[in-house]
Amino acid sequence: LDFNGGLMMLHYGNLQFTNATQLNDPFDCHPSLIDFSNVPKEACGGWTPEIIEELRRDPFRRTREEAWICSLSKIYDSILMWSYYSKHKGICIGLDMEKVRKSLSHMWGGTMIGCAEVEVQYKDIVEKPDYFRDAKDFFHYQISTKAKAWEHEQEVRLFILNPSPAYMALLPGQNDDKGPIDWKEVRAFPEIGGECFESVYLGINMDVEEKSKIIRVARKLNPDIKIFQMEIDANAFRLNTKLIE
């Protein structure tokens, strides 16, 4: 996360969910991950194969528009991810996933907040399954499959279908001055407990004042949170951590 994103996450104690159509990878959750073209005759029932193909594809198109995703990672020390997400000037936040799951599964304002969790699988597009012939959970496949180019991220996803407006919010700079905002551009920010925030990792190139702000806000959110400074390993191309007392 960059400084501002990390600061807001710690200040409000929430997670950010983004609509699948707004993710930075255009292949993400796309119906084209599944092959609908091999329509068997017995599936037509008097309709043309083209119509059946569209009818079967359409629910997956809607799923992509209705799914909001929170992208997490199993790792905190990827040089590549630190570089392209924040130029080593931001932070990485460690979560206690057992507590996150518990926090996201409760009643709030009469609305059940709950989300599903999937571990991303990385594949080549040529491996896409045949909808009519392969025995797969195609919904799970659509939500959890990404290109092998992303494999280094070791992503774990939380996702919500059609999140409640109660925890939707605009980002700074978003407004309706130029007309209505597309609902898919609005993020969901369900709140989780401070105990869910287990650790914070500070980037190597982080500004000193910004670092102090992060430490102060993190310890206010969870007095027991562990805070680490990322450091360069002098003997290898890797990052080390140093606990800040």
Please give the residue ranges for each predicted region.
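Partner-binding and oligomerization surfaces adjacent to conserved cores of proteins
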Residues: L1-E245
